[in-house]
């Protein structure tokens, strides 16, 4: 709970007191590992322009980045996580209900660390990145506005650089058990196969990436495109795209 409070309030330590309010110790943010994490100074780009239709009816009132998780909107939780690792420059690509997003963050302590890029039309999960051409000249984190990845971002950067990746896709391992027997039907209605409660494991795309700035130069302006299509384009050019599981 102390760690969560420090992240939300952007403070580095909290005193631990007993019932008589005598200090018994100090709890440091990230257990004192902040000094090392501050070395991670990369821009963060957040795709925050979608309508959030899968979250209806909530997103009919609030834009998806402002959907609350506890006391804070999810976008602020995401930003706080990056701040934990020393990131201090945030680029938000906005469209739907963008004035609400800007108004909210204007009242926060991190207002001066955020730059907005306004889409004039929906450009998909990748097209909006064309607005950042010439603005970013180093590797950057790219994240959806509805996913909190609890990983070591410094380790992701180390993996990205050691493998000379153009794009690193952060994936999550998922394991599912279908709670029913699954039947495969053959020709004529015969049973070709029958498996009781089969289990499947696979890697899923979290919507969290580490991207080299050269990728921005290949994105056409004012063209709607998904970031997975951008990934495929880079792979087609022989660029290295790797998975961080």
Describe the function of each predicted region.
Residues 28-67:
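N-terminal nucleotide-binding beta1-loop-alpha1 segment
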Residues 163-173:
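A short, conserved acidic/glycine-rich loop-to-beta-strand motif
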Residues 140-141, 148, 154-161, 174-177, ...:
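Catalytic-core segments of class I nucleotidyltransferases/pyrophosphorylases
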Residues 1-10, 17-18:
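The conserved cystathionine-beta-synthase
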Residues 27, 96, 143, 210-211:
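A conserved hydrophobic position in a structured secondary element of the catalytic/binding core
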Residues 11, 40, 72-145, 150, ...:
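Conserved N-terminal catalytic core of the sugar/cofactor nucleotidyltransferase
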Residues 11-15, 22-37:
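Short beta->alpha transition motifs characteristic of CBS
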């Amino acid at each position: 709970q102390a760690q969560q409070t420090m992240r939300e309030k952007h403070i580095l330590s909290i005193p631990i007191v007993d019932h008589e309010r005598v200090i018994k110790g100090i709890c440091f943010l990230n257990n004192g590992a902040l000094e090392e994490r501050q070395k991670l100074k990369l821009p963060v780009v957040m795709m925050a322009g979608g309508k959030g239709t899968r979250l209806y009816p909530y997103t009919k009132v609030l834009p998806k980045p402002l959907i609350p998780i506890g006391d804070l909107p999810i976008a602020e939780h995401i930003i706080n996580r990056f701040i934990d690792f020393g990131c201090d420059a945030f680029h938000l690509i906005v469209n739907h209900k963008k004035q609400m997003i800007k108004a909210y963050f204007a009242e926060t302590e991190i207002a001066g660390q955020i730059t907005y890029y306004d889409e004039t039309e929906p450009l998909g999960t990748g097209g909006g990145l064309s607005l950042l051409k010439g603005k970013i000249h180093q590797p950057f984190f790219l994240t959806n506005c509805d996913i909190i990845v609890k990983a070591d971002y410094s380790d992701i950067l180390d993996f990205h650089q050691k493998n000379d990746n153009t794009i690193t896709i952060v994936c999550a391992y998922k394991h599912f058990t279908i709670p029913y027997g699954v039947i495969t039907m053959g020709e004529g209605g015969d049973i070709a196969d029958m498996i009781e409660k089969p289990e499947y494991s696979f890697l899923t795309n979290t919507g969290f990436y580490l991207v080299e700035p050269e990728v921005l130069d290949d994105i056409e302006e004012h063209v709607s495109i998904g970031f997975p299509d951008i990934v495929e384009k880079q792979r087609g050019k022989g660029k290295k795209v790797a998975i961080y599981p």
